[in-house]
Amino acid sequence: MSVKIRMHRAGAKRKPFYRIVVADSRMPRDGRFIEQVGYYNPVSQPKELKLDEDKIFEWLQKGAQPSDTVRSLLSGAGLMAKLHDAKYNK
């Protein structure tokens, strides 16, 4: 089972709202997921991003792969650098 951290679309038509979830890669985009670890609202000004850093860090250490979009959001929040430091600076 390959686990991904990706975005699960919610909200109304033309007003997207994304939940950041941990899901099996074989599940559909808006299908079943294992755990919700944050959300992203690109419509609000300024754009709203909330992440449960402890849970995300735990899943990344277990081997979950973030999607490209989620990876860029995590990099902007500083989580990818934190993971890199924990992994290589023992």
From Swiss-Prot:
SUPFAM superfamilies: Ribosomal protein S16. Pfam families: Ribosomal_S16 (PF00886). GO terms for cellular component: cytoplasm; small ribosomal subunit. It comes from the Bacteria. Keywords: Ribonucleoprotein, Ribosomal protein. GO terms for biological process: translation. The keyword Transferase does not apply. One of its GO terms (molecular function) is structural constituent of ribosome. NCBIfam families: S16. Belongs to the bacterial ribosomal protein bS16 family. This is Small ribosomal subunit protein bS16.
